[in-house]
C-alpha cells in the first residue's frame, strides 16, 4: 500500500506556475457539489495521483485550498485513485458534474 502511494507521489508533473504552486499531483472527476455548513464540498472520484489536505483544487485560474477530505462520512488524511470522496473547500468554486479538475501541491 505505501509503495503504491510513493509511486503516485513520484508521478507529479512539474508545470510553470506561480511561486505558491509547484506540482500537479492528481486529477478528480466531479460528481456534484454540496453546501456543508459555511463551506462548499465537491463530491468527486480521484482519477490520478493523490489528494491531501492543504493541496489546491484548480479550475481555470481559480484555485481553492482543500480544508478537509471525507470518505463515507469519515475524515481521512489523503485519497488515492478510485476513492469517492467529499473535498471540503476553504472557499467557493463553480463546478459541474463530469468535469475533471486538477490538484496541485503547495
List where the protein language model places each region.
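Beta-strand/loop-dominated core regions that host nucleotide or nucleotide-derived cofactor-binding catalytic loops
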Residues: 2-50, 56-106
